[in-house]
């Protein structure tokens, strides 16, 4: 294992003092104990992670939505089973300049289009058309993704609560990190408030079930499924 070099370099006293000064007004909020995690909390997968699952689970619960989208970010602190989840950990997963939550009514066809568009950004065979590295995270929805399929045909077997997603039916979808100015001014609270509320309501213990992946046959096919 490589050493963590930051632990071997003495801190600059002036910078350390500045950091303490800047953090001081927020220490109580940052240090709030939300819950103890029963499992590993991480955010390193291309399709999902347990931090991502916590976020989408919270959006569904707090927004009374049928499914939820979360951006494919991969930063933040990983926590081991038994670690205390503090507000600072939640903020370092979600604190961006456009953290507002959204609720939209989308048809099954529109939901598939969103997933297909992101997939094409990731898996287009022409590298000049590849525009991102991570799939949008999804809560409440089960689907199969075949990266080697043609554009518009990578997402199949979409299911909500075990039933096939209806292309013509409208669903309530929660999300966050809207890029349009109009959406950011719609009045949605910062996303971290939702997982914080969910964690506080779990009586001090928090367990997050992370969907698994399948790799049948020779063609890579990932399965993203809701927790049992």
Enumerate the language-model features and the residues they cover.
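Hard-cation-handling environments
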Residues: 2-85
């Amino acid at each position: 294992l490589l050493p963590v070099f930051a632990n071997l370099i003495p801190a600059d006293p002036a910078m350390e003092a500045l950091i303490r000064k800047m953090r001081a007004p927020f220490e109580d909020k940052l240090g709030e104990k939300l819950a103890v995690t029963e499992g590993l909390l991480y955010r390193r997968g291309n399709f999902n992670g347990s931090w991502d699952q916590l976020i989408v689970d919270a959006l569904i619960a707090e927004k009374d939505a049928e499914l939820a989208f979360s951006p494919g970010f991969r930063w933040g602190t990983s926590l081991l089973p038994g670690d205390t989840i503090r507000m600072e950990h939640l903020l370092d997963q979600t604190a961006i300049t456009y953290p507002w939550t959204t609720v939209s009514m989308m048809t099954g066809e529109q939901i598939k289009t969103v997933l297909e568009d992101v997939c094409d950004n990731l898996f287009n065979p022409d590298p000049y058309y590849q525009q991102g590295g991570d799939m949008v995270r999804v809560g409440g929805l089960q689907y199969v993704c075949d990266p080697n399929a043609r554009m518009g045909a990578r997402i199949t077997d979409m299911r909500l609560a075990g039933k096939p997603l209806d292309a013509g039916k409208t669903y309530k979808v929660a999300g966050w990190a809207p890029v349009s100015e109009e959406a950011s001014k719609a009045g949605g609270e910062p996303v971290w408030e939702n997982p914080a509320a969910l964690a506080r309501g779990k009586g001090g213990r928090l367990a997050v079930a992370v969907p698994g992946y399948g790799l049948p046959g020779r063609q890579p096919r990932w399965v993203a499924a809701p927790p049992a």
